[in-house]
């Protein structure tokens, strides 16, 4: 993987040199040529994102569906190998790629919005804040704590300082991030799963278990993965988020 990343980074550097070489020496404006295109892309995607975020997911009206269709159009134009290179590239290369593709720009903007909410939002007593994070992941913040479940994202490891524990329902790559898992282990924070470590690790749940982490009361059980023939593959989490949320219970079983 390191060799692949080095090759990708070298190709990115050569591409960047090509853009510089093609620049017009007599025109130093950052609003023309390649830079101008990037600025227009950012402005368009920012406007689309704000249209989505200013609407309610509970009300599916024409405005929201039109915005979602536009975002789907961004995704349809992104080649899978380009997205894979973005996910696996060095941080600097991936950050630069975000400026060149609308769906990747949106992908990062959505993550930054979630991070801002986790770090800065104040959760009132009797409530909980919930963010859906591409594509199976959730982050839940309460007045007294924060946890995440099934997070798979290029920048997932940035969540580690701000969450108290992480849950992973099963070993499918769209449900976990190795970088985030390792960051949590490095910080000495609990990672609940049925496969990451053997049963000597207290947070390995291969069946019915009960945990208390802060004000969170967690129950686990094991189940099969839909019709894929994977028996006892998925851990179901039932998480009582505490009295300061009105004993809100979050359940995740995907």
Q: What spans do the regions from the language model cover?
A:
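Bacterial N-terminal signal peptides that target proteins for export
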Residues: 1-10
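Intrinsically disordered, low-complexity regions of eukaryotic proteins
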Residues: 4, 25-28, 212
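Bacterial N-terminal signal peptides
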Residues: 10-18
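Intrinsic structural disorder/low-complexity segments
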Residues: 11, 175, 253-254
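Bacterial Sec-dependent N-terminal signal peptides
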Residues: 18-40
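Core dinuclear metal-dependent hydrolase active-site scaffold
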Residues: 33-161, 202-254
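Active-site metal-binding motif and surrounding structural segment of the metallo-beta-lactamase
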Residues: 151-196
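Short gly/pro/ser/thr-enriched loop/turn and capping motifs at secondary-structure boundaries
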Residues: 198-200
């Amino acid at each position: 993987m390191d060799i692949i990343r080095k090759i990708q980074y070298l190709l990115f550097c050569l591409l960047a040199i090509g853009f510089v070489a093609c620049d017009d020496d007599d025109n130093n404006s950052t609003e023309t040529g390649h830079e101008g295109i990037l600025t227009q892309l950012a402005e368009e995607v920012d406007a689309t994102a704000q249209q989505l975020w200013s609407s309610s997911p509970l009300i599916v009206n024409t405005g929201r569906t039109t915005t979602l269709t536009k975002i789907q159009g961004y995704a349809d134009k992104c080649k899978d190998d380009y997205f894979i290179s973005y996910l696996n590239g060095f941080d600097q290369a991936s950050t630069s790629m975000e400026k060149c593709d609308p769906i990747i720009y949106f992908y990062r903007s959505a993550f930054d919005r979630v991070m801002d909410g986790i770090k800065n939002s104040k959760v009132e007593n009797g409530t909980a804040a919930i963010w859906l994070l591409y594509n199976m992941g959730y982050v839940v913040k309460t007045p007294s704590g924060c946890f995440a479940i099934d997070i798979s994202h290029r920048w997932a490891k940035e969540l580690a300082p701000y969450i108290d524990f992480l849950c992973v329902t099963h070993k499918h790559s769209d449900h976990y991030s190795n970088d985030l898992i390792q960051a949590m282990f490095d910080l000495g924070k609990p990672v609940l799963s049925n496969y990451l470590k053997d049963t000597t690790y207290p947070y390995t749940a291969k069946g019915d278990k009960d945990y208390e982490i802060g004000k969170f009361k967690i129950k686990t059980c094991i189940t099969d993965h839909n019709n894929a023939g994977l028996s006892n593959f998925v851990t179901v989490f039932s998480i009582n988020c505490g009295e300061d949320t009105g004993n809100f219970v979050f359940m995740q079983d995907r």
